[in-house]
Regions:
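Conserved nucleotide-sugar phosphate-binding/catalytic loop shared by glycosyltransferases and other
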Residues: 5-13, 34-81, 226-228, 313
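Active-site-proximal region of nucleotide-activated glycan assembly enzymes
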Residues: 36-37, 58, 117-176
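Donor-nucleotide binding loops and adjacent catalytic segments primarily
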Residues: 46, 51, 55, 178-262, ...
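Structural loop-to-beta junction motif characteristic of Rossmann-like glycosyltransferase folds
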Residues: 57, 121-122, 260-261, 278-286, ...
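Glycosyltransferases and closely related glycan-assembly transferases
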Residues: 88-101, 109-124, 137-141
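Acidic donor-binding loop of glycosyltransferase active sites
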Residues: 98-100, 257-271, 279-280
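A short, well-ordered alpha-helix in the C-terminal region of glycosyltransferases
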Residues: 333-347
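C-terminal alpha-helical cap of glycosyltransferases
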Residues: 346-365
């Protein structure tokens, strides 16, 4: 199958954290051969549809809901949806003549990966977190390959299947630019993942109100998420703080490259993008992530010296302002953090995954 057209189906839905690493992989498949066809399977959520449409990919939908953290009755009801979701997935895979199925974790992956196994289609899973989620642990035994970002996650899977390669990052993040200054100011980028984070939003608002140093030092770009956008925008307006407030940044590669300092969640995709761009960061892990994987991710980066971690339970405007002022008063430390972030990047994750996928498909011919 070397050099031949391949039809790829990717189970990746819900949030940008699941979507963007898969999009990076999909784009590289299509860059190598324009005839390669990629279909995403997702939930039909507005943000997901918007991201995929913006990136130029088609999406099919299956009816499935999460199980972890839903309560006993809801979990049992949602388990009952799985057989139908597997059947729906099998129909999509047949209709697309799928040669390869990629699962990215989350509750969309198991039905699609199981359907691929039943149809004897090659299947791989991507696990970008330091502690694998339940979905990938469940389908790990039937996956042909398991791609990891953290070496410490290896013991959750069969050793022969595991490849530690990093997290795919879109090619746009590798285009070098210099940190942008607006009116002589550095750029502070704030985002709480693709859906935003109310706790981070509130802390940044309070920090900017309280800290004249922050207001004088930074031009602020703040991705709020759709739900919290109007509240945050109104709060800045009432306080007279000049901030660029947007619900979602489709041009994140350009904006992140231009940032001097970043305040963000610690999803695996975000951490990979920060490393590629060599950005120092203040990380606020999402406290309700399955198996607390965001804190594990953040601590791993903190140990390298590339980030400062503030737990959400400890996050206030005063604490955030203190950390930001401390970093900006020691530019040499900020530079060291950026250098250590850059040193942790893995530039060949996408290429390694694609080569492994091609080897798998060639082995079936």
């Amino acid at each position: 199958m070397t050099g031949a057209q391949v039809n790829i189906v990717i189970a990746a839905g819900g949030t940008g954290g699941h979507l963007y690493p898969a999009i990076a992989l999909a784009k590289e498949f299509q860059r190598q051969d324009r005839e390669n066809m990629v279909t995403f399977i997702g939930s039909g959520k507005q943000l997901e549809n918007s991201i995929l449409a913006h990136e130029g990919f088609s999406v099919a939908h299956i009816h499935v809901k999460g199980i972890v953290g839903r309560g006993l009755w809801a979990s049992l009801k949602n388990v009952c949806l799985l057989p139908k979701a597997v059947w729906q997935s099998m129909k999509i895979l047949r209709d697309r003549s799928a040669d390869l199925v990629i699962g990215t974790g989350g509750y969309f992956s198991p039905p699609v990966v199981c359907a691929a196994a039943l149809l004897k289609i090659r299947r791989i899973i991507m696990e970008p977190n330091a502690v694998p989620g339940l979905a990938n642990r469940v389908v790990g035994p039937i996956a042909d390959r398991v791609f990891l970002a953290f070496d410490g996650a290896k013991h959750y899977f069969h050793e022969a299947k595991v490849r530690v390669v990093g997290t795919p990052v879109r090619e746009e993040f590798f285009r070098e630019t210099t940190a942008r200054q607006q009116g002589g100011k550095d750029t502070l980028l704030v985002f709480g993942g693709s859906q935003g984070a109310k706790a981070i939003n509130t802390a940044v608002i309070d920090a900017l109100k309280a800290s004249s140093i922050m207001r004088e030092t930074f031009a602020v770009i703040h991705q709020t998420g759709e739900v919290d956008h109007e509240r945050v925008k109104a709060a800045y307006a009432s306080s007279g703080v000049d901030v660029e407030v947007v619900p979602f940044l489709y041009d994140m590669p350009q904006v992140l490259q231009a940032a001097t300092l970043v305040v963000a969640r610690s999803g695996a995709g975000t951490l990979a993008e920060l490393a590629v761009c060599g950005k120092p960061s203040i990380l606020v892990p999402y406290p309700h992530a399955t198996h607390n994987h965001q804190e594990h991710n953040a601590r791993a980066v903190e140990q390298t010296g590339a980030a400062v971690v503030i737990l959400e339970a400890e996050l206030t405007g005063q604490r955030l302002a203190h950390e930001i002022e401390r970093l900006m008063s020691h530019p040499e430390r900020l530079g060291e953090m950026g250098a250590k972030s850059f040193a942790g990047r893995k530039v060949d994750a996408t290429a390694l995954m694609i080569q492994e996928c091609r080897d798998l498909m060639n082995a079936m011919v």
